[in-house]
Amino acid sequence: MTYNITIGNKTIEITESGYNILKAILDIEFSPPTVVSFCSLGGYSAQHVNHWLNHFTLFGVLDYEGINSTTFRLLKLNKDFELFITNNQ
């Protein structure tokens, strides 16, 4: 399976963990600014989640700021993208 995100007219292949982290973020009841625990996003390490938050910021999907080693503040979430899985078989 291939995990993808389409933003505007650009499609980017992402990892399964990146897909799962973004899906978990989309499930958050978001009203800016929302404080989020790294461990609430699929059980990945804070470093791994932070890695993907940086990618999603560069992609224009969200904006965030770190608070400490366990939480971050979700400042903006652009829902103008499509997250999808394709089967390569």
Ranges and model annotations:
Residues G43-L58:
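Short amphipathic alpha-helical interaction segments
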Residues I28-S31, F59, N87:
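Surface-exposed polar/charged interaction patches
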Residues N9-G18, I67-Q89:
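Short, cationic-aromatic polyanion-contact patches
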Residues I12-S40:
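Short amphipathic alpha-helical interface segments
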Residues M1-T11:
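Long, low-complexity, charged/polar intrinsically disordered regions in eukaryotic proteins
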Residues T57-I67:
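A short, conserved structural fragment
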Residues T34, W52, L77-D80:
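N-terminal leader/targeting signatures
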Residues I21-A24, W52, F84:
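Charge-rich, solvent-exposed alpha-helical interaction surfaces
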